[in-house]
């Protein structure tokens, strides 16, 4: 029991020395019992201290109960998955609430949208701006693996499950992924230094030290760093020229810094030296030992 300064025995809910306690109609302190509150909720008071429980769970007569921050007791639900049909899956926690966001359940890294629906076969944007992809069947976050979303669109999830972007070295291959994470294949990518590289149409590997074509008989050359060359180049002993897009010049002229022109063979792309050539304008021009020719106005 507890008596106040006037000697009155206290009853009902009381706060004494910072502890929330409860005394029944006779004034006896309640311990190890449920109490019905005036607002229709229920609270529970500790069996030893008599203090109202908050932010915890308890088991009484084999039943599990949850206690919130205000001390309101509710019967615990059994956590588990459930479906509403149409392959929509949810997970209810011990309070019976649908979980949302990133969750680790039974060792699986899963994700549930704002409505609680489990994400399967879809991308999710993480808090740091990166993206992750969740398996079509299990819903598990993909980690350290390539995956495709159809239409030959390939991606790679790193060891944290983040979909990579930009230049990457994976299993010894030099690959590139666009800003959405889609792997670049059979296309150019712009490097940080402004140069361009080309990635193989099947493997996605960056082409290095090789000629290649992008179709329509347009030829390019990737140097030892995998950068597409531009301007005048000597490759395998041949004097060649590539325009500012990297396309090899064939059957056409290029203007030199001193105002002279050079001509590059229509078949081999080799610079014309010590010979006459009828250039595309119809004029005949002689190209000297340096491969330079001059056109009269």
Residues of each region from the PLM?
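Extracellular adhesion/carbohydrate-binding repeat motifs centered on closely spaced tryptophans
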Residues: 1-297
């Amino acid at each position: 029991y507890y008596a106040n300064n006037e000697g009155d025995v206290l009853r009902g809910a009381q706060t004494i020395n910072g502890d929330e306690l409860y005394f029944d109609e006779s004034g006896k302190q309640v311990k190890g019992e449920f109490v019905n509150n005036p607002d229709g909720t229920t609270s529970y008071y500790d069996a030893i201290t008599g203090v109202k429980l908050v932010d915890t769970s308890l088991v009484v007569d084999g039943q599990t109960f949850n206690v919130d921050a205000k001390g309101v007791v509710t019967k615990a639900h059994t956590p588990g998955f459930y479906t509403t049909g149409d392959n929509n899956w949810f997970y209810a926690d011990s309070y019976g609430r649908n979980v949302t966001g990133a969750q680790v359940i039974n060792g699986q890294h899963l994700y549930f949208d704002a409505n609680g629906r489990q994400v399967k076969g879809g991308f999710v944007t993480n808090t740091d701006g990166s993206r992750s992809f969740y398996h079509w069947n299990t819903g598990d976050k993909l980690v350290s693996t390539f995956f495709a979303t159809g239409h030959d669109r390939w991606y790679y999830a790193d060891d944290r499950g983040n979909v990579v972007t930009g230049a990457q070295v994976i299993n010894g291959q030099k690959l590139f992924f666009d800003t959405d994470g889609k792997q670049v294949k059979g296309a150019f990518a712009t490097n940080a230094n402004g140069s361009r590289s080309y990635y193989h149409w099947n493997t996605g590997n960056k082409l290095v030290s090789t000629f290649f074509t992008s179709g329509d008989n347009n030829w390019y050359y990737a140097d030892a760093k995998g950068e597409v060359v531009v301007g005048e180049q000597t490759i395998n002993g041949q004097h060649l020229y590539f325009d500012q897009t990297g396309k090899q010049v064939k059957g056409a002229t290029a203007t030199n810094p001193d105002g002279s022109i050079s001509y590059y063979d229509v078949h081999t792309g080799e610079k014309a030296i010590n010979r006459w050539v009828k250039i595309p304008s119809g004029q005949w021009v002689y190209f000297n030992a340096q491969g330079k020719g001059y056109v009269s106005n």
